Amino acid sequence: AESLIYLAFLSSHRVANNVPLISLGAQQAIIRTEIERDDRTLNIDLEINASKANRARINGNPTRSQREILGACQIVYFSPEDLDLVRGEPGGRRDFLDRLLITRTPRMAGVIADYERVVKQRNALLKTRSSASALLPWNEQLIKFGAQLTADRIALVEALNPWVTKNYANLNEVKPASISYKCSSEGVSNNFENNVEVLTKRLEEVAYQEIERGVSLIGPHRDDLHLQIGDFPAKGYASHGESWSMAISLRIGSFNLLKSEGSEPILILDDVFAELDTSRRKQLMSATQIAEQTIITTAVESDLPAELLTQKFYV
């Protein structure tokens, strides 16, 4: 399951770098996949390296960038770590949005990578108290990539929200649930041109503060996905059961959204059934009925509902 997730996002959902994914003493790991879609067969090889850039091949032909394989394997996964989407820090929720963005629109991987590169370089300049003229080209790039990323994230949240609300209600929860985009810059929207204006103005307003603190204070790297249950934010107020319901609703809602737009993502349920009560297990099971392909992993076979024990592989 983890190899498919890596193939879909070019990063692991469990570890921060490639080293733990490679066998001790080896120089690289290789994922080989055959994907059949729209009467076409794609053979994708991805070489994962610990100390240099990954390399990819499509039908034996080297790609210029590993990002060219994004979109070939669409994944929605649910794992025990998803409880952190509700209880954890904003970075995890931003990562959730960005991975769904990449699945929905693969070209956004380039925008996200460019934005992260700009923020890193800009922060390095701010720490050295560089002049305004040195910061100017990086400000322009932060505005350009930040405006696009913010617009696409907001559009994604607007499209995902009804599915989250519906799935949460299907879990027989009494309080309604919703999601919204919490931005560090007031006035942004799903419109790129509007966001360029907003970010330009906000950067001017915080220019002195940024130099004093040595860090970029404005942009989507400071934003959050707000999760609401009833009258209160889920983080800090949701019960253990409500937190699981919200996590399930986010993941199954993601699957519903992609499917409604014509995609057929693979649904991966990674060792989660032991964590769930009967009603939440049933909600996950209902999702497997509409998925073209579902992969379920578990360390303990008895954790799985009997209805799902169709074809088993032991690893």
Question: What does each model-identified segment do?
Answer:
Residues 17-18, 97, 104-153:
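Long, non-coiled-coil amphipathic alpha-helical linker/lever segments
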Residues 1-6:
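Pre-Walker A-like glycine/lysine-rich segment at the N-terminus of P-loop NTPase domains
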